[in-house]
Amino acid sequence: MKVTFEELKGAFYRVLRSRNIAEDTADECAEMFARTTESGVYSHGVNRFPRFIQQLDNGDIIPDAKPQRVTSLGAIEQWDAKRAIGNLTAKKMMDRAIELASDHGIGLVALRNANHWMRGGSYGWQAAEKGYIGICWTNSIAVMPPWGAKECRIGTNPLIVAIPSTPITMVDMSMSMFSYGMLEVNRLAGRELPVDGGFDDNGQLTKEPGVIEKNRRILPMGYWKGSGLSIVLDMIATLLSNGSSVAEVTQENSDEYGVSQIFIAIEVDKLIDGATRDAKLQRIMDFITTAERADDNVAIRLPGHEFTKLLDDNRRHGITIDDSVWAKIQAL
């Protein structure tokens, strides 16, 4: 089925207000969920909303909490999220990193006691739209086996890097081959994964999303490389925020909350003039996209460039929502 942006935001707002969320908070949160979905990231927008409400109802999320700055060291700040709403807090933290970068050239905000930020790419994009390089990542509950293990002991720990090119170039990737949200998207669509995404119950690589969702043996991105990167991202976020590691979140909490996150903004224009910046970025993009194609029918893509088209299509033709997901939201 298809819905308009206003219908989608209205559905989110209704559910949030039914939980006695303050009007301005409910409006901003509903806006962010709707914008994420409109951008084509269904896995962390509309599909994730029922899970968000579950955590809200369980008390994992404290909707009226106010994040508090704990430490200030010039270009670096440490904040405590107080388990406030994840996407609203993350937006505020990247805004703060941008403010610090405008003063120092670079700004870094380390956040503890945070909740799931939904679409991490929103915050990298937020920085790039203002002309900054945006880098951010989060740890999580243990949902992935380290390389060589069967048990989940590391997080998917998504990493975002956004560049202020035209259009914006952005990598938004979990440390697994696919996020659990994308496993759900493919399962709901009745599709196999395009490449192996995890192991089946016999320890063989599989493209079946439902099998991986059930046994939790998701495949690290780049095998041992993604496993290693997940571990060091967790260590950095934990140390800089003085917050919880994947081990602590997993062993001490009843669900995924109280995570640690990093937000970095870099003001490129303090280091290079605008014309030179644009020319260098365009040369990089042209050099890549003019390579001889392996398949004439498949274009060479740059990361993140598809979001501009997805957003335009959804604004023109309406936002496609899975019927079962829409039914869940209507029942909340």
Swiss-Prot record:
This is 2,3-diketo-L-gulonate reductase. NAD(+) binds at residues 168-174, 224-225, 304-306. Disulfide bonds: none annotated. InterPro entries: Diketo_gul_Rdtase, Mal/L-sulf/L-lact_DH-like_ah, Mal/L-sulf/L-lact_DH-like_NADP, Mal/L-sulfo/L-lacto_DH-like_sf, Malate/L-lactate_DH-like. Belongs to the LDH2/MDH2 oxidoreductase family. DlgD subfamily. The lineage of its organism: Bacteria, Pseudomonadati, Pseudomonadota, Gammaproteobacteria, Enterobacterales. Homodimer. Catalyzes the reduction of 2,3-diketo-L-gulonate in the presence of NADH, to form 3-keto-L-gulonate. Pfam families: Ldh_2. The active site is at 44 (proton donor). Keywords: Cytoplasm, NAD, Oxidoreductase.
